[in-house]
């Protein structure tokens, strides 16, 4: 009787038209209920509705109102949180396989089966990769997954490495060695083995891709400048352009430097032996001749040649720094030639540092944290290492070499893998100006600073450098840290463009071809120019892959570090250890503080900072928390934090500000 009833159809249409739909992302809570986070509002999801979804699902829902209360009823799935995911194995009381998702906010236990290609016998706690197969909203079935890859056993101490690499789909093994390697030289190689090249690296470094020789330029008896000869390892001489090795390097893009070990971009036989500029061994190299005046200005064009070189000494950063800083009982150069090279390179470096201070931008000094591991992968200690003078000597030599490479490629090849940075994101230029003026301007200097920080000026290389130099002496860290949030990302481009972060008009790296694929590409382009060939424009796909691989490697390094920090600090909870920290972030949930001594990040919930929520105000534009209208905590602020909890399963570290 109701079939094909036009009145009923009309009624259904009216009911549907009166429904209020919203779209958003599911946010789980510690309880059975959750919230739907929409653009401008958050809606309550009751427990029964939460059974249809999981944290992170993007869904469409209907708003339901009763009295003054609002909640949503889930309508449909827009995008599931999970597709491919990492999990730990467990078995229920009936010995059925289940998966615990490795995500701090996902509490769902997912039934699963195993793909036939997984041959390992799974045990409780094992780490696996899985694929979500069914979802209640999409398939009218409960959540169900399939294990597609075994990662490691539950008790594997190296789980942080293997799990993280699997999460980001990164290889854990080096590229396999070839049976043999042949040189494929099109250019004649000059014999430069008589030049006294040296390398400066960490003692443990095997993949040495740069060696330096320096001498003064003289007119008669008067020194007028410096001639720096930069020899760079030449892996492209062993790797044909469309070979499997080239394709593997293009996919990896970078050597992955992880706590405890690295995963090289090239086979170790190449990276650590045939191409590495080891002492007292003849090696093929691409060599650049760079000349400067005594003030560090580049004079004339850089000359590139294909050559044979032989490093005469492998020097260590700390030894060279101790010698130059005249540390008591310091290491001394083992020959007069080595001493001369160190002293000349030191003088050249001081000139280049001063040149960059006046004409570009210098890096703000901040320590690098390194994990010292036991053989079983446990953390013995964490060290903070600062750049000393020997590090700066290599750094300045590589920077000038990369500036010269960029100019050579721009002038001759008209293409390359150029490192670029546009400075502030265009949409943030006015915000950056406002922040600078709010922080620095007073009645006397407001007009001058308004002109200095004009958005159109901040968008230029010259204007950006002027701004950076003007804030160099500002005593508080929050200014520098806040400005970073307005910056855009560095990019690889095939056409020359400024790198505002360095304060340089053109920059292209070629000094690390053993560990960076973009440098290999630039080597090939330099060789094409030297051969008189038409250089091929760098493919967009290469630039995209470089960008993605750089992002992935940073995430891998961060995730492993988070895990190791949690392991390292876990035994200290009982001792209620206190740390000197610096606030690294302020968000709606709390404060994140970085431990100065070891780099760990400790989360401090807002609830521990003040007992009256209504008296607290988070101001995102300042990255600050106000209490009772007064600024209480801000990014860059020094605080003391007591460690209160470490959750190993989520790698979260919690503390209280004291």
Curated annotation (Swiss-Prot):
Keyword Hydrolase listed: yes
Listed under GO cellular component are: cytosol
Gene3D superfamilies from the UniProt entry = 2.40.50.640, Nucleic acid-binding proteins
Q: What is its main location?
A: cytoplasm
Signal sequence bounds: none
InterPro entries this protein is in?
CSD, NA-bd_OB-fold, RNase_B_OB_dom, RNase_II, RNase_II/R, RNase_II/RNase_R, RNR_Ribonuclease, S1_domain
Limits of the RNB domain: 189-530
- Which EC number(s) does UniProt give? 3.1.13.1
Q: Where in the cell is it found?
A: Cytoplasm
What catalytic activity does the UniProt entry give for this protein?
Exonucleolytic cleavage in the 3'- to 5'-direction to yield nucleoside 5'-phosphates
Domain of life from the UniProt record: Bacteria
Q: Which residues form the S1 motif domain?
A: 576-658
Q: Which GO terms describe its molecular function?
A: exoribonuclease II activity; RNA binding
Cross-referenced Pfam families: OB_RNB, RNB, S1
Q: Tell me the function of this protein.
A: Involved in mRNA degradation. Hydrolyzes single-stranded polyribonucleotides processively in the 3' to 5' direction.
List the HAMAP family: RNase_II (MF_01036)
- Report the sequence similarity comment from the record: Belongs to the RNR ribonuclease family. RNase II subfamily.
What protein does this entry describe?
Exoribonuclease 2
Q: Which organism is it from?
A: Actinobacillus pleuropneumoniae serotype 7 (strain AP76)
